[in-house]
Amino acid sequence: MAKLVWDESGKRVYETGVRNGVLYVQGENGVYEKGVAWNGLTAVTESPSGAEPTALYADDIKYLELFSAEEFGATIEAYTYPEEFEACDGSASLGKGVTIGQQDRKAFGLCYRTIVGNDVKGNENGYKLHLIYGAKAKPSEKAYATVNDSPEAVTFSWEVTTTPVNVAGFKPTASVTIDSTKIEAGKLKAIEDKLYGTQDQEPTLPLPDEIAQIVKGQ
């Protein structure tokens, strides 16, 4: 038996940052198209909801609790967005340089990276890859203001809902998280090669079952 010890060196872990955003627009056939870099990404706020308990009573006592289905949502904030995202934001092109709004919104996938730091290695300790599937962006306001003596760039923001995808042996999910401090380096590289592309292959968004095959070495 061992006595509990708190705040040991190297175990004071924190998470911060957001970078390396990649957008994967979903085609009409349901397959994600090749990924494109999302520059200017400033924040992604994950907002799961649901799993609300409903108490059932019998024989004058609490009998059990049923929980509602859990859903995954998020808010994306950025200074800019890829041209490919316009179709996900309800825009369509009438011709080069001309777009119209209030059109059908395409679903998309998203990948981004956050830092996993600790008290010894700081921000160089590791990182997490966050994958989001079946996302759709809600309409959002865009606030333009006059240039003044305290200039600020417009920050775009989108609330996102998701439709989960199937995972063999588990409930469907709309999110996958990959921790570089725990996964084997070779398997992490194989996943990143798919996400970011290589000299020989386009960047793609692997589904959870494909990621599971890589992790299990199949």
Describe the residue ranges of each PLM region.
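Mixed-charge, glycine-accented linear interaction segment located at domain edges/termini
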Residues: 139-142, 146-218
